From Swiss-Prot:
Its main location: cytoplasm. Gene3D superfamilies: Aldolase class I (3.20.20.70). It comes from the Bacteria. Belongs to the KdsA family. This is 2-dehydro-3-deoxyphosphooctonate aldolase. It catalyses: D-arabinose 5-phosphate + phosphoenolpyruvate + H2O = 3-deoxy-alpha-D-manno-2-octulosonate-8-phosphate + phosphate. The keyword Amino-acid biosynthesis does not apply. GO terms for cellular component: cytoplasm.
Length: 280
């Protein structure tokens, strides 16, 4: 299924697109700098791009952790990014988020993985009529996402993406099964792979999550080779000082070489076609 986002279309057989940005809005200056650099990189690569940042991280490990600037200031900053840099915006919403207020600013709404089974929430977000990126829960088998998508589609909104971000594998660990990407295609939705949250070690530092960012390129290449519509990566100029998800964020300075590789891989895979679709 093809989906229109701003001025480009996304889909399995279309060129790879990027969702990227810092995990959380730390400051207007940082957000503008990161968004500007990502726009420059993706323009050079002719890669469609959606900027991502959160105004409120509601599921932090500790109540003392930084959550973001809040909705009022956060939306003001995201709107400035959108208007100044002319890039589409995605941000995550929660059960107590005033959805219409957010939908009036951003181009895509994102539902957190932990909330993918909350039926009323999924329906409410989809009912806004905006494109929605539904992140698959770390506790869900890929084929179970068909039912989540069905809840969203029941509102009449067919502009739904599904995002794989790893599966719980023991304590404080996630694992990525590349077969899940092919299974998620059966939802008929564009499939996204979150290469940075997939290397997260949830709660691994006790009061915060750990991560293994050195494996981001490995999983990003594998997912692109498996066949996806888009790649999701959180990035930061100095991940070790990021206020959220630093251990699994990919350094901004290393985004371009990684994206160059992914673009070439994507081209080869999609030009060759997907043999698994005719394997039976």
């Amino acid at each position: 299924m093809l989906m229109q986002i701003a001025d480009f279309e996304i889909g399995l057989n279309n060129p790879l697109f990027l969702i990227a940005g810092p995990c959380v809005i730390e400051s207007e200056a940082l957000v503008m700098d990161v968004a500007g650099e990502l726009k420059s990189i993706t323009q050079q690569l002719d890669m469609p791009f959606i900027f991502k940042a959160s105004f409120d991280k509601a599921n932090r490990s500790s109540h003392l952790s930084y959550r973001g600037p809040g909705i009022e200031k956060g939306l003001t900053i995201l709107e400035k990014v959108k208007k100044t840099l002319e890039v589409p915006i995605i941000t995550d919403v929660h059960e107590d988020t005033p959805l219409q207020e957010v939908a009036a600013v951003v181009d895509v709404l994102q539902t957190p993985a932990f909330l993918c089974r909350q039926s009323n929430f999924i329906r409410s977000v989809a009912a806004c009529g905006k494109p929605v990126n539904i992140k698959k829960g770390q506790f869900l088998a890929p084929w179970e996402m068909k039912q989540v998508v069905a809840k969203a589609w029941a509102t009449g909104n067919k502009k739904i993406m599904v995002c794989e971000r790893g599966y719980s594998f023991g304590y404080n660990n996630l694992i990525s099964d590349m077969r899940a990407l092919a299974i998620l295609r059966e939802t008929a939705c564009p499939v996204i792979f979150d290469a940075t949250h997939s290397v997260q070690l949830p709660g691994g530092h006790g009061t915060s999550s750990g991560g293994q960012r050195e494996f981001v390129p490995v999983l990003a290449r594998a997912a692109t080779a498996a066949g996806i519509a888009g790649i999701f990566m959180e990035t930061h100029p100095d991940p070790d000082r990021a206020l959220s998800d630093g251990p699994n964020s990919w350094p901004l300075a290393k985004m371009q070489p990684l994206l160059e590789t992914l673009k070439e891989l994507d081209k080869v895979v999609k030009n060759a076609g997907f043999l698994e679709q005719s394997s039976e």
